[in-house]
């Protein structure tokens, strides 16, 4: 029984020591903001106040029934995000006249802009103002004022004076 306990303890120490560098390899390189369904920085359909680096150009493809969206996103300045998207709505016809539409589904295009008003500081969040679906049909039109702040969370495991710390960023 004592042999099994020592073996278990050695295995736990080995796994704890090897997990920390592996987590750093996977968590920190991918800490840039993600794109939402509309092709702008955010989560799912919610925009955030974060922006990618100046000079970034990105392409985004999102499928969330009944919407399929393709987007081109550009960051010409550190304070501006501009995107163009083309949307296919699977459950609606192109026209109210079924004989005119045939099997063609409804399509929509739109242009979005987001302006960063305040950059994140130690106590102040990122603040941005955005307008969605400019020069489109207005189906997905929205105006928003959004704030985003990074929060660091630390977790520790301490056993026999051996400590492993995992740092996560919630955004």
Give short role names for the model-derived ranges.
Residues 163-171:
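Active-site pocket-lining/capping segments in soluble small-molecule metabolic enzymes
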């Amino acid at each position: 029984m004592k042999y099994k306990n020592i073996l278990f303890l050695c295995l736990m120490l080995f796994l704890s020591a090897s997990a920390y560098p592996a987590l750093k390899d996977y968590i920190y390189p991918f800490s840039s903001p993600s794109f939402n369904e509309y092709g702008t920085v955010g989560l799912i359909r919610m925009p955030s106040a974060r922006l990618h680096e100046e000079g970034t150009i990105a392409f985004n493809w999102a499928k969330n029934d009944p919407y399929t969206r393709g987007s081109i996103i550009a960051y010409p300045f550190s304070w501006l995000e501009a995107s163009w998207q083309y949307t296919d709505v699977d459950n609606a016809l192109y026209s109210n006249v079924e004989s005119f539409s045939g099997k063609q589904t409804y399509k929509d295009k739109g242009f979005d802009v987001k302006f960063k008003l305040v950059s994140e500081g130690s106590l102040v969040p990122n603040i941005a103002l955005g307008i969605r679906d400019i020069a489109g049909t207005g189906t997905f039109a929205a105006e928003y004022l959004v704030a985003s702040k990074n929060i660091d969370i630390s977790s520790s495991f301490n056993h026999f004076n051996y400590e492993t710390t995992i740092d996560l960023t919630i955004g």
